[in-house]
Amino acid sequence: MLEILMSLTAAICWAFNGIAYRKGVKDVSAFTANFHRTLFATVYFLPLALRDFPGVVIDLQTALVLVISAMLSFYIGDLSYFASLKRSPVSIALPASSTYPVYVVLLSTVIYGAELSLNALISAILVFVAVYIIYGSGEKGETSGLFYALLAAFSWALAILTLDFLTDRLPVSIVAFVRLLLCLILLSFTAKKDELSTEIRLFFRSVRGIFLLLGIMLFITAIKVSSSWNVVQPSSTSPVFAAIFGAIFLKERISFRLVAGIFVIILAILLLLLPPLQ
């Protein structure tokens, strides 16, 4: 129960992150905005990492998995998602990329030998359905847009599965800080140099970093307490919360699609709390 709540709270934090982006830093590219957000989050994580670092030993295998995890999540995954958005509308890119919980549940049986839970699998599918209900509008885009969205989902799924391995060997703060630091280095090559010195509202940059820190900390802790395939579903509901917060804070229209999507998300979360289906 606790890990489900932590994962759900992480999704809420990431949704607020999106609202902060749309409210205060949307005048720069997504790459530069992510660079600023990651920079602040890395700085925020530094004291926690320094506190937990004494006595920590990172062997070669763990270091390699850390690098792979950061590249899959923040570089290959995010870049593929942005490539998808360039080639197809949000109504295609977002639902397709939201299939990553399904991959996590299925791949966990191969990578970790986990038992396939019907509750977890159906819950993951329901999350995808909810995102599709809200954002899917039947618009058409390039086939490559769909491919990049699915590639992003697959990359994110693999990155999430590495967290089970990493949290067994390292404190949560170290895992989060090192991954963010590696991400920051990678983003420094893709952020637009002429935008790095652009005057953006400092408040919104710092707020995005705070929400990123809270979301990552809660999600990785949830994985450490349980396992990725049991907690990934609530964390992937951030697009639904983003739509809700958009209606509340940005005065966006509340549609029947949004209400229906919320109902499906509630079913998905309840399914994780029910006894296992046979």
From Swiss-Prot:
Disulfide bonds: none annotated. It holds the Pfam family EamA. It is found in: Cell membrane. GO terms for cellular component: plasma membrane. The chain crosses the membrane at residues 1-21, 30-50, 56-76, 92-112, 116-136, 146-166, 170-190, 209-229, 230-250, 258-278. Residues 12-136, 154-274 form the EamA domain. Keywords: Cell membrane, Membrane, Repeat, Transmembrane, Transmembrane helix, Transport. It is a multi-pass membrane protein. Belongs to the EamA transporter family. This is Uncharacterized transporter AF_1533.
